Amino acid sequence: MAIPFRLKIIFFFGTILFPISSWTQEVFNYANFSEQLQFINPAFSGIETKAFLSTRNQWMSIDNAPQTTSFAVSSPLKNNLGVGLNVLSNSMFVQSRTIASADISYKLTISEQSEIYLGLRGGGYFYRADPLSLSTSSQLTDPSQQVQASFAPVIGAGLYWTFNSFWLSYSAPQLVKLGNLDPTINSVINIQHYAAAGFNFSLTENFQLKNALILRKSENFDATQQYSSSLSYQNLIELGATYYSSGNGALTGMLNISNLFSIGYAYEKALSSQTSGLDRRTHEIFISVNLDSILGKSPEIEQDEEVETNQQ
């Protein structure tokens, strides 16, 4: 059976950009989280046809501080199915963690204004710690400093519901607790849960207010929240702010170019007086490519949409 052209494009993007996406934090922590739900919810893979690349650099003045790069590509297919590929990685000090996964989703049409997407995720978690990468003045090698590398499976699931201008997301991108990745430092990846919701409110014909909230819960850690609000002008320019329950705040912005590219930026820093003296500035940038604008909708998807319209 011949591989559809759209799938070839998806795998092309994945093959080319996979090496670039070399470094994610265990807990999803992006300021522009509502634009990057595909990284935590496999159900999101069937909604848009796009390629997405983002980077997040924390604590800019500190050497070997956390650096995150993420890549995703996704597309709806015929028969209400959708697919996606994701790479999320993080490097910090001598450690690097990379999660590579594939998603599949199925769309349920509830009404003309409401749809539910169900998603499953499978992939692998790659961990590496290299104490030998530390530069020292000594020419001798410490025999206790050995490179630690391990692999573990990734299994996740998610649900995404849209109703008019409201959306709701729940996902568990990692349903299996991963332990003993590095026995020397007791490296463990816990089961994670994410719940998010958003509502877009039209103020005028040109201006729209977008609000979103996400709650995170990881085993053995307290739940954290993040709230964002932004003002959009004709879906071309968007400016907003994000607040973290940890005491950080961020200013965000996004620019849409000819319905083809979206470029976003966020500047985050500590708001708490106890930590504001520390240099905890974080810069975050992403670019999203609308593949539908480049490739056009596939005949299979257009046919499915026409059938759904006739049935309604």
Regions of interest found by a model, annotated:
Residues 25-312:
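Subset of outer-membrane beta-barrel
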